[in-house]
Structures are given as structure tokens and as C-alpha cells.
Regions:
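Long, low-complexity, charge-rich intrinsically disordered regions
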Residues: 1-8, 105, 110-111, 183-203
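Positively charged, structured surface patches that bind polyanionic biopolymers
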Residues: 1-16, 27-35, 98-124
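Generic detector of well-ordered alpha-helical segments enriched in charged/polar residues
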Residues: 6, 18, 72, 118-119, ...
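Winged helix-turn-helix DNA-binding recognition segment
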Residues: 26-93, 141-199
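Short amphipathic alpha-helical segments that mediate assembly, nucleic-acid/protein binding
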Residues: 2, 14-18, 43, 68, ...
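Cysteine-centered metal-binding/redox modules
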Residues: 21-23
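Short helix-coil-helix linker/hinge
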Residues: 9-17, 122-131, 135, 139, ...
Length: 203
């Protein structure tokens, strides 16, 4: 089983879907023992490889999920600089996933994801679901007890979503059911200041 190390920034505006595709095809760097290197011969070849990686994950729905134009835009976007380096001369992408204290001074926030988690998020292809799950996962780890509790508004505010749009809260409620059914999280109830709240744990 591969583990994926991902920097966690709550209000990032990166598109996680494309980042996860790059993680899926990365090969190991023997010096760090991390899957952080993507080499390619041309953007056409890399585009094809990313689409194959997605279709191998989502076998019931073969399609093109990224075009050469979109890939070029993703690779050249400054907003992705926290997550990978792109060298278009040597045709190599290096994922920034080395979070040892020596590299970061122990200050970087990061999450470790499994193949199963990455595949689940790729198949559902929802940025809101991805950000919601990463939020739960990060704060379960941060607590040191594998549990966290928060309100929908707390998550939405931290992730720069509108707290006034009722459809977001409806979606989050449906995501709770989905994540529980997929055995990725458990949810228990407790009362706080007279109100019932959810407590989340990662399985």
C-alpha cells in the first residue's frame, strides 16, 4: 500500500483532483523513499498517462478527465507552488511531500492519505467533499485522540465557502452519510451548550 503525504492548507485554492492524479503516477525517490517524481516525454504523453490513471481507478466510467490545455494550465499555475515544482526543461515534476523536521523545521501541516482514500476522492471528483474529508482527517490527527468536532459553519469559514448558502450544508450532511457508509469515518453525537453536535473519528 502506498501512502501519500500532502501539505494541508485549509483555504488553499488548488484543484485537488489534478494534484491527486499526479500523486497516482509518481514514482519513488530512493533518497527520500517518497513517491514524489513524475517524469514525462511530452505533455501529450503525460495527459494520456493521467487519464489512464483515472480510468484504472474508476473502471466503470472511462473518459478523458484532463486535457493537454488544462494540464499545461495546472502545471504553470503559481497557486500550485506549495504542492509541486515543475521543470519544463528537464520534463520532471517533483511533488513537495517531504515533511521531515529537517526539511520543514517541524512547522508544516500535512496529512497522510492511503491509496483507498485517494481513489475514493478521485472517483467522486468533488472539491467540496475532498476539502471536507481532509479537514476531518487533519483535525482528527491534530487532536492526538483521533477525534474532532466542529460545526458546518466552522468548516465553511475555514475553507472560504459561504456560510449563507444552504446547499453547502445540505451537501455536508450527505457527505457525512457517504463517508460513514464507505467506512472512512465514524460519527457519534454529544451535547454542547444544550445543542447536539457531531464528533468525528477516522477509521
Amino acid at each position: 500500500m502506498r501512502n501519500y503525504y500532502l501539505q494541508y492548507i485549509e483555504d488553499t485554492n488548488i484543484n485537488y483532483f489534478y494534484l491527486f492524479l499526479l500523486h497516482k503516477i509518481a514514482v519513488v525517490d530512493k533518497s527520500t523513499r517518497l513517491y514524489n517524481t513524475v517524469k514525462y516525454s511530452s505533455l501529450e504523453e503525460l495527459t494520456n498517462r493521467l487519464n489512464i490513471a483515472y480510468n484504472n481507478t474508476n473502471k466503470d466510467n472511462e473518459k478523458q478527465v484532463i486535457s493537454k490545455t488544462t494540464l499545461s494550465r495546472v502545471l504553470n499555475s503559481d497557486k500550485n507552488g506549495n504542492y509541486f515544482n515543475y521543470d519544463n526543461v528537464n520534463k520532471v515534476i517533483t511533488l513537495k511531500n517531504n515533511f521531515t523536521k529537517r526539511q520543514t523545521g517541524g512547522k508544516a501541516k500535512f496529512i497522510i492519505l492511503t491509496d483507498r482514500e485517494i481513489d475514493f476522492l478521485l472517483i467522486h471528483k468533488s472539491e467540496l467533499l475532498t476539502r471536507y474529508y481532509l479537514y476531518i482527517k487533519y483535525y482528527c490527527g491534530f487532536s492526538g485522540k483521533n477525534e474532532t468536532d466542529f460545526t458546518a459553519n466552522q468548516f465553511l469559514e475555514a475553507s472560504k465557502y459561504s456560510t449563507k448558502a444552504g446547499n453547502y450544508k445540505t451537501l455536508l450532511s450527505s457527505y457525512n452519510s457517504l463517508l460513514v457508509n464507505e467506512k472512512l469515518i465514524t460519527i457519534s453525537k454529544f451535547r454542547f451548550n444544550g445543542q447536539e453536535r457531531n464528533k468525528y473519528s477516522i477509521l
